[in-house]
């Protein structure tokens, strides 16, 4: 009863704080001059992190097992993992471009988990025999940590594509305008002016965007490399556990199949980084596709409730 009450309090604290943080982010998005609100948002993230940590510890103590047995608990753990990623650049005292991805990801994940849509899974239950294994914590935690990491890396790659698409769109629209200008007005003068411009140093906004995309690309590669390693460990742990539980290392279960597809997509991404012709926009496109694949693997298969991993949001125990 004590743990249930504590979990209830911590859940409401995290949800209330997340609601405030979302409001602050919307205000700072619309009114950039209110920079002081950003500090309040960061403090709200810290409160949410400690609330989530307290919830996980309380859930662990009350149930007797690490809280990863259903979709609700896994979403809570996923938001906790996203916050860990959020703090890494701060520890390194580096420019925190990663926070532009991790902050909204943490907010949305935690907000969905505590919104009331998964209320039937809030009550802690005893693990079914299939999940009563020491491999539960190792396998599921590695998979969720890899999902959190790969999602952040994929979103960073998507941000690169958006920035480059906007630059290309601006370039072609400007080029079209220049062609019309040269055709109808001051053609000789404009040609000389363009020649001078071509030999000058790139403008500051373009140079800033170039630096930004390079930083995002570097962060994306490092984050995805870490996530790919965690995913590989998680899949290997799952294979060992599957052999103990079902007598086979691999069964081509829907979850296993999509985990393999996810692994393949990011293996292609990492391989493309070694090829100069594919490095940049092409590799970022592969990683962006991986973002959708991860959500299908993690969320979509659970909701369908099919296969050996059928622990979706509408069922408390595997079939």
Curated annotation (Swiss-Prot):
A GO molecular-function annotation: heme binding
The principal localisation class reads: plastid
Going by the entry's taxonomy, the superkingdom of the source organism is recorded as: Eukaryota
Q: Does the keyword Metal-binding apply?
A: no
Q: Which UniProt keywords apply?
A: Chloroplast, Cytochrome c-type biogenesis, Membrane, Plastid, Thylakoid, Transmembrane, Transmembrane helix
Biological role: Required during biogenesis of c-type cytochromes (cytochrome c6 and cytochrome f) at the step of heme attachment.
| Family as reported in the entry's similarity comment | Belongs to the CcmF/CycK/Ccl1/NrfE/CcsA family.
What this protein is called in its record is Cytochrome c biogenesis protein CcsA
Could you tell me the gene encoding this protein?
A: ccsA
């Amino acid at each position: 009863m004590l743990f249930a009450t504590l979990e209830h309090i911590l859940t409401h604290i995290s949800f209330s704080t997340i609601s405030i943080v979302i409001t602050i982010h919307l205000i700072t998005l619309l009114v950039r001059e209110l920079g002081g609100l950003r500090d309040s948002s960061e403090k709200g993230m810290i409160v949410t992190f400690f609330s989530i940590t307290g919830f996980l510890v309380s859930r662990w103590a009350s149930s007797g097992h690490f809280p990863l047995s259903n979709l609700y608990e896994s979403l809570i753990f996923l938001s906790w993992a996203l916050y860990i990623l959020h703090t890494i650049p701060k520890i390194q005292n580096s420019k925190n471009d990663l926070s532009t991805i991790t902050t909204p990801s943490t907010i949305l994940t935690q907000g969905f988990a505590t919104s009331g849509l998964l209320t039937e899974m809030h009550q802690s239950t005893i693990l079914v025999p299939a999940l009563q294994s020491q491999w539960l914590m190792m396998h599921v935690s590695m998979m969720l940590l890899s999902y959190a990491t790969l999602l952040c890396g994929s979103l960073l790659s998507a941000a690169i594509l958006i920035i480059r698409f906007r630059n290309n769109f601006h370039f072609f629209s400007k080029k079209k305008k220049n062609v019309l200008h040269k055709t109808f007005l001051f053609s000789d003068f404009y040609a000389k002016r363009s020649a001078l411009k071509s030999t000058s140093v790139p403008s500051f906004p373009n140079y800033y965007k170039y630096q930004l995309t390079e930083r995002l690309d570097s962060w994306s590669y490092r984050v995805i490399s870490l996530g790919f390693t965690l995913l590989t460990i998680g899949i290997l742990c799952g294979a060992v556990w599957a052999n103990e539980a079902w007598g086979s290392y691999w069964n081509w279960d829907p979850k296993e199949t999509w985990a393999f597809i996810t692994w393949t997509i990011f293996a292609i991404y990492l391989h493309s980084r070694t090829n100069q012709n594919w490095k940049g926009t092409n590799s970022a496109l592969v990683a962006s596709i991986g973002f959708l694949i991860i959500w299908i693997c993690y969320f979509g298969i659970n909701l369908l409730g099919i296969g050996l991993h059928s622990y979706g949001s509408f069922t408390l125990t595997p079939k």
